[in-house]
């Protein structure tokens, strides 16, 4: 079950003008609970004014068994991200959920692979953990990172990436692409999009060599990168995406759902609670929270999968899904923040163990 614990901030380190890395001290009794797969995220919770805010941030590293770190980049209008950058200090305590998320990769010591990461801006955060863990665990594996930023000054983890390159000079290929800073090669100037990746494919990179590809950054970049990799011959099952938000994406349900008055049974911590939806409820999660249920959630945008549950009976309509894998969908898992009941006998189980 997803659980929050109060963790003390061990240190806050600036990465760029707009970004910081926050490291939490994890007590020995909780270290197993905060063991993570590279690529997963933490959900942080705080109250600002009268509002409870929850936000997901990717785990960037775990430098010691008793520490775990996330990176936060302040964004325009982002109450939590600006609070994190400006107000969170060492010694403060924050409510932190145990690691969650489907994105990422668990390195295997015996495996020899070729991996690709495509990131832009703060999308580097989960990649740093994945790349570092993979190269240290799989001694014969190789990683290529294509990383886009406005300039070298806005580049998060610049020193950490340089250190990784020094440590694994033959096994890590790092390509930095800047949109507002010209380097010697025009190939490394501009934005990461389909045209840029096609140009790299013609001159520098054989994209068909990679066993797995990981993509994280702005939605348009991710969509372009995914489509281009498929066009270049990479199997869809080998392409993994992590979206931080769905801004600019408008989603409409495929079917009209009349959920007002519908009752849904929510199973959590071994107990069943019956909730009734109103016309104002946009999802099963909204209805349950309104009626006092303390369910796990964070983004409410279909991205983080924190609110994942399993449909035990009945049918639901899920408006959108940016996080569940096909095998999870086939097993009956849905995102409660995106789901409404289609039948009158729906039971959803938040205790069901998901697929890692």
Where are the language model's segments positioned?
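Iron-sulfur (Fe-S) cluster-binding segments and ferredoxin-like electron-carrier domains
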Residues: 289-291, 306-355
């Amino acid at each position: 079950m997803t659980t929050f614990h109060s963790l003390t901030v061990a240190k806050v380190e600036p990465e760029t003008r707009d970004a910081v890395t926050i490291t939490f001290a994890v007590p020995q009794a909780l270290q197993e609970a905060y063991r993570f797969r590279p690529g997963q995220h933490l959900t942080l919770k705080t109250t600002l004014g009268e509002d409870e805010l929850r936000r997901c941030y990717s785990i960037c590293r775990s430098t010691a068994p008793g520490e775990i770190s996330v990176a936060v980049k302040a964004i325009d209008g982002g109450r939590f991200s600006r609070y994190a950058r400006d107000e969170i200090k060492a010694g403060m305590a924050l409510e932190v959920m145990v690691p969650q998320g489907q994105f990422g990769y668990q390195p295997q010591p015996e495996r020899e692979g070729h991996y690709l990461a495509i990131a832009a801006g703060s999308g580097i955060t989960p990649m740093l953990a994945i790349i570092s863990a993979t190269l240290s665990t799989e001694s014969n594996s190789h990683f290529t990172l294509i990383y886009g930023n406005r300039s070298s000054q806005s580049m998060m983890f610049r020193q950490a990436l340089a250190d990784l390159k020094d440590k694994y000079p033959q096994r890590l290929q790092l390509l930095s692409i800047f949109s507002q800073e010209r380097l010697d090669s025009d190939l490394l100037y501009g934005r990461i999009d389909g045209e840029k990746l096609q140009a790299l494919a013609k001159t520098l990179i054989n994209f068909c060599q990679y066993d797995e590809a990981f993509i994280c950054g702005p939605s348009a970049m991710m969509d372009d990168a995914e489509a281009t990799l498929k066009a270049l011959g990479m199997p869809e099952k080998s392409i993994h995406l992590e979206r931080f938000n769905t801004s600019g994406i408008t989603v409409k349900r495929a079917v009209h759902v009349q959920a007002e008055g519908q009752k849904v049974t929510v199973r959590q911590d071994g107990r069943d609670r019956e909730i009734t939806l109103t016309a104002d409820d946009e999802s099963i999660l909204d209805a349950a929270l309104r009626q006092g249920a303390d369910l796990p959630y964070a983004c409410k945008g279909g991205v983080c999968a924190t609110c994942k549950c399993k449909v035990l009976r009945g049918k639901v309509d899920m408006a959108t899904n940016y996080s569940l894998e096909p095998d999870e969908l086939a097993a009956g898992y849905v995102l409660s923040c995106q789901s409404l009941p289609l039948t009158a006998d729906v039971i959803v189980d938040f205790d069901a163990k998901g697929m890692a």
